[in-house]
Each structure stands twice: as C-alpha cells, then as structure tokens.
Amino acid sequence: MISVIICTYNREKYIYNVLSSLAHGTFPAHLFEIVLVDNNCTDDTHAEVDRFCADNPSVTLRYFVETNQGLSHARNRGIKESKGDILVYVDDDATVNPDYLRTYADWFASHPETDAAGGPIIPHYETGSEPRWMTYFIKRLLTGYLYFGNKPGPFPGDNYPGGGNAAYRSRVFEKVGLYNVELGRNGDSLGGGEEKDIFDKMKREGMQFIYLPQAILYHSIPGYKLEADYFNRLTTGIGQSERARTLRIGKSSYRKRLMSELKKWCATIVLWCFYLVTFRPQRGNMLVKFRRNVTKALLGK
C-alpha cells in the first residue's frame, strides 16, 4: 500500500488538480490512499477536496486538520495517519505524470535495499515564461527544480530528493525520527531545512535514496514567487533555518556550515564575473542577493 501525503495551506486554486492527476494515473486506485493534511486553511480548500471526492469515489482520501501551524507539523501528522508501508509526499500546488505512483511502487518492490527515492521537479511558470535573470541555482531555490538525467541511480554528490516529490519506506521515520518542527515553513513564513535535516540523518544511518527519472512532478510557479519580496523572504528563511539546524546539532556543525558559506561566496563571485563578461549582469546580481540574504540570516543578523 502506498500512502500519498499532501500537506496543504490555502491552496484552493491547485488542490483539485493535484488530486486529479493522482486519481487518473496508471496505478490502481485500490493500491493507494491519499492522506490530506489541512494545516488550518482559511480558504475553500476543503470544498475543493469534497468536489474531488464526489467526482472520484473509487479513490480513498482521508482528510485531517493539523491545528499546530507549520509544514513539519503537517508532515508528521501525515506520517502518523498513513497506513501504507511506502509514504509519498506530493506538493499541493503541483501535478504528477500518469506513471508517477507506478514508478515508485515498482522500484520499491524490486529494490528492497532502497530506503527513499525522488524524481524530477519541473517548474510550470504561470506567467508563461522563465525570467531572464533566472540561473540554475536560483531556479532550484525558487521553483524546486530538480533534474539529474534519464537514468535511475543514487543522487549525485550532496543532493537529495525535493520535499515535494519524495517517497520513503515507513521504516525510515521509525529509524531517524520525525521532521524537526523547529524547521520548515509556517503559514506564510518561508523557513526550510527540515528535508535536509531528515536526509542528513539518513546519510548518517547509511540509508540509500535513489533518483527515479520517471516519477515526474510539475510544480506551478505563480507570478508572485518571481518578485523581489518573495525572493528576499525565501532566501532569508533559508539562512535562518540553516542556522537553527546546524546549531541544534552542535557548534562544530555550525562552524562547518560557516566555512561552507565562505566557499559558496567564492563560487558566487566567480559566477558573478562570468555573467558580467557575458553581458548577463542581472543573473550575477541575483546570485549575489541570494548569497547575501542567506549569509546575513545564517549569522543571526
């Protein structure tokens, strides 16, 4: 049994579409359930879920309200309420390809050594086009973009599955614990780090997570996510979360993260120079803004 966990907060515009894409896939409805966790929605999300249930009576959907605000609280509630031995997290503002659930099910069934997996995350810009200032690094930050080719295998380097397209065996959380509720998004605040925290724990336990190119998720990107205010709040949230995450582990972990930040600044300066001499200064300037906001918050300023 697969449990698809969708944590949602005020996504009336998108929730029907993501549910519909799961329902109309190639994986049989009796082999999965949808665990929907409402994290105190104030819009018509519930009404849209009711509409989906009326239109798709063969799909098992269980609806829960998590009153503790925050994505990590909602994710943990999803784990506790799930009945499946495979837990798949799907973003509430996305859609998935028809073979999405079948891809995960087939891989876990034939590879018992795999503890977790994730697939590509492809942005869908509601504005119709990608901004000219977008770089690969900013794209990953703002849209969750993730693509490592068309062959399955271990995630390269220090990469790990995106939180909105990740599948786990339930035993993972029995081993490493639940999401850290001090990290992650909370209402309209844009913290993060809870996914990295989980995968860092998995690495320390020697667990395996695999990239599956056929488990594709399409992430809707509204125009406001491309504006300066959102960018500044998101990058500041990353720095704050990294500070909290590493200090929680210990001072040595925090110092190591500061050294990593210094190396990232060196790379940022090199890229800024590259974009300057190739007459694309907007891209370089955005990278500098990103790094500056993260560093400032990482230092607690």
Spans of model-derived segments:
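Short, well-formed alpha-helical segments that are part of the catalytic scaffolds
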Residues: R11-G25
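A conserved acidic beta->alpha catalytic loop
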Residues: S21, D38-A47, A94
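Non-catalytic, C-terminal membrane-associated alpha-helical segments of glycosyltransferases
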Residues: R233-S241, L247-K301
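A short, conserved alpha-helix in the catalytic core of glycosyltransferases
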Residues: G163-Y168, V172-V176, L183-A215
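Glycine-rich, basic loop-to-helix element that forms the pyrophosphate-binding segment
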Residues: E66-S82, T103
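Short aromatic/hydrophobic "clamp" motif used to bind/position activated sugar donors
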Residues: L87
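Short, flexible, basic/aromatic active-site loop/helix in glycosyltransferases
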Residues: F137-N159
